[in-house]
From Swiss-Prot:
Phenotype reported upon loss of the gene: Normal arbuscular mycorrhizal (AM) symbiosis with AM fungi.
Gene3D superfamilies hit by this protein: Ammonium transporter AmtB like domains (1.10.3430.10)
UniProt similarity note: Belongs to the ammonia transporter channel (TC 1.A.11.2) family.
Stated name of the protein: Ammonium transporter 2 member 4
Organism listed in the record: Medicago truncatula (Barrel medic)
UniProt subcellular location: Cell membrane
Membrane topology: Multi-pass membrane protein
Length: 480
């Protein structure tokens, strides 16, 4: 039986390419992109005080654009290209037609798809770092920090863990979709950069939800983040397979469990549940399951949700207020707790719950000496040593990511502050968006609201609308 003409290989659809896999990978990449733009843009712009809404959203928006430009120019090849040293690839462009239309190093789709998919992950990582720096970092310093960090920090961790030639990848570390590469890195780097930049002005350090300017929009941004995680974890196998389906289901089950536990703890200890708490529980659940999504069973995903909803809650709500060092570092979006702590937890729990069969299906290797969770190693005679080894590798990767990011992020901050101040000056800290961008996110609330009649181009400097002709409708008025 002959195949339909649209399924036959041709120059645009080579024999090696699977159209279904390619379509899913592009969809997954777009979903991850939507987590950033507009997901985190909305979330950041809504969680901060209204005087910092524009700046917070802009930092995320700029980071995404800047990273993608660096990514195709040199960073992709440094992360996944030909090995230069054991932890880094050779810098090179990823824009050549011959390269982009060729087969990716994994999956049955072209390099162009892989470059885009991995690029949106890199962009998201920098936006997560921004969450620890909102409300006081000099925007010019941020514009320098972004390309430097993606070049000298992200690429090293990505190559080491995700590239087949990376030293931790060869060791057998399990990081299904970025618990180490993205979340642990972002949490540690954000916390380190926050140390160097310093805290926000006292007036801006109100606790949530008092500082939040629009809680409904917080939920909108959080919803985009949550649903976009279907592409985040579901695209990790690089194939539209059963493992992708399992990863997506585990992601949402773990997240639901984490939210439930966090909200219950808030209710028990503080007397009432909060939207802010639910969103934090959502993030910790999503982060914790990320390194394990497609290689653990459903019941393990629920247990991981219980743990991710409780331990980060304790470190954030209790321990943070008791440890002087933690109190001194201003982390507006609690990136350290929701990403560094939750990411490290996820990595350790992955080493415990990873199912050998699922790992074999994901990594497509017959090597049973690797990728064996400790829980399964203890159940099988002769595999205990392999399970213990896997836990050691997982912890080894955590130590590497933490140490490298603290060192490199500190070095980048020190270099940037030689060029421009890391921190905004006093006037800008007091004024916020108006001083930095000359824009106001909430013009209706401005003390100097002005209305312009578009047809006559007349400006009314008063809130008394009696001077406006009755024939003019509000639809013809525009705020300035």
């Amino acid at each position: 039986m002959e195949l339909p003409s649209n399924l036959l290989p041709d120059e645009a659809s080579p024999e090696w390419m699977n159209k279904g896999d390619n379509a899913w990978q592009l969809t997954a990449a777009t979903m991850v992109g939507l987590q950033s733009i507009p997901g985190l843009v909305i979330l950041y712009g809504s969680l901060v005080k209204k005087t910092w809404a524009i700046n917070s959203a802009f930092m995320a928006f700029y980071a995404f654009a800047s990273v993608l430009l660096c990514w195709v120019s040199w960073a992709y090849q440094m992360s996944f290209g030909e090995k230069m040293v054991f932890f880094l690839g050779k810098p090179n462009v990823a824009l050549d037609e011959k390269f982009l239309l060729g087969k990716a190093f994994l999956g049955n789709f072209p390099n162009a798809t892989m470059v885009f998919y991995q690029g949106v992950f890199a962009g998201l990582t920098l936006i997560l770092i921004a969450g620890a720096l909102l409300g006081r970092m000099n925007i010019r310093a941020w514009m320098l920090f972004v390309p430097l960090w993606v070049t000298f920090s992200y690429t090293v961790v990505a190559f080491s863990i995700w590239c087949p030639d990376g030293w931790l990848a060869k060791r057998g570390v399990i990081d299904f979709a970025g618990g180490y590469v993205i979340h642990l890195s972002a949490g540690v780097a954000g916390f380190t950069a926050a140390y160097w930049v310093g805290p926000r002005a006292d007036k801006d350090r109100e606790t949530f939800p008092a500082a939040t300017n629009n809680m409904i929009m917080v939920l909108a941004g959080a919803g985009l983040l949550w649903m976009g995680w279907s592409g985040f974890n579901g695209g990790a196998p690089f194939v539209a397979s059963t493992i992708a389906s399992l990863a997506i289901l585990n992601t949402h089950v773990c997240t639901a469990a984490s939210i439930t536990v966090w909200v219950m703890l808030d209710t028990f200890y503080f007397g009432k549940p909060t939207v802010f708490g639910a969103v934090q529980g959502m993030i910790t659940g999503l982060v914790c399951i990320t390194p394990a999504a497609g290689v653990v069973q459903g019941w393990a995903a629920i247990l991981m949700g219980f743990i991710s909803g409780s331990i980060p809650w304790y470190t954030m709500m209790v321990l943070h207020n008791k440890v002087n060092f933690l109190k001194k570092i201003d982390d507006p979006m609690a990136v350290f707790h929701t990403h560094a702590i939750a990411g490290a937890l996820g990595g350790i729990l992955t080493g415990f719950f990873a199912v050998p069969k699922l790992c074999r299906l994901f990594y497509m290797v017959p090597d049973w000496e690797k990728y064996i969770g400790l829980a399964y190693g203890l159940q099988n005679k002769g595999a205990t040593q392999a399970g213990l080894k896997q836990m050691v590798i997982q912890i080894e990767a955590i130590v590497f990511v933490i140490c490298y990011n603290v060192l490199m992020t500190s070095l980048i901050c020190l270099i940037v502050r030689v060029i421009v101040p890391l921190r905004l000056n006093g006037d800008a800290l007091q004024m916020g968006d108006k001083a930095i961008h000359g824009e106001d996110a909430f013009a209706l609330h401005s003390e100097a609201t002005k209305f312009v009649n578009i047809k006559r181009n007349q400006v009314y400097d008063t809130q008394d609308f009696s001077s406006i002709p009755e024939s003019r409708s509000l639809g013809e008025l525009q705020m300035v």
